[in-house]
Amino acid sequence: MKTLYLPASDPQTCDAAAKILREGGLVAIPTETVYGLGANGLDEAAVAKIFIAKGRPQDNPLILHVADPIQMELFAHDIPAAAYLLAEKFWPGPLTIILPAKDIVPKRTTGGLSTVGIRCPDNETTREIIRLAGVPVAAPSANNSGKPSTVTAQHVLHDHDGKINAVVDGGHCRVGVESTIVDLTERPPRLLRPGGITPEQLKEVLGELTVDESVTAEIDPNKVAKAPGMKYLHYAPQAPVVIISGSREKAADYIRHFYQPGERVMCFEEELELYEGCDPIAYGREDDVATLSAGLFDVLRELDKPDIPRVYARCPVGGGLAFAVQNRLKKAAGFHIIDAEEIE
């Protein structure tokens, strides 16, 4: 299969991508979060191609992307008032809402569940593609399953060239981590995955919000996952990742002491000079968490090489968007965290 490269700047791109989706093909689409691997979310055969291309477990549900917020009524029932409030405030945007699924949504799309995640992405090109296709687009992140997500079209081609019909190049993704997922079928609402819409922002609308245990710790492999990213290995390069927490000085002392040639250090820009001789790479500034979010998967993919035996990673602390970066890094590390403050 030849994978078509479709620049978002080309006026024919949206029509071409929409035609492929209508005909049951796979198109990688840009969003503000990460690139998605899209198919007609109502076509079971098309959706099955996503799982094959990614090597994705069948019980890992997909998110339906819509062109307009009101379209959630086409695919969900018993929609609570909170969903409309969230959509009004945050859509188009990096928020997925879990709702009871209508029968029109195939079980292959929902991972066998009675619920479905719906999102209206903040990318004009992709919304136009969805509108022209006339179908909701089921789209997980466009990386090989378990690997770091794709935030450029070149990342997508690295993983899927020759395996999918087309990739739409919309440039580098602005947010850089997958959407926030909130489950409105639970009372109180439950955060299943942090992202560009923060828990603090959600609480302003919802009042009360609980955080699923899978966000901060490994999930029981037998537990049903209601959203992507809740179980299975995610976001990981080939080398084991170890998060080193603690003060800047303590962490640097620990890493410099145990560092072996060939290993890499993934740190903040402000820390680069502390790791001279340890082959450091910065993924953003500690004092600007948006740069960490935008640069996270760029660096994890850069470190996804067979000749790197280990990656030491520094992780931001605190809430807001930093909470989402923590979640992705901890999952990439398999929750392997060493507190340098506790090392004598």
Where are these regions (language model features)?
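Active-site-adjacent structural elements in enzyme catalytic cores
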Residues: 1-344
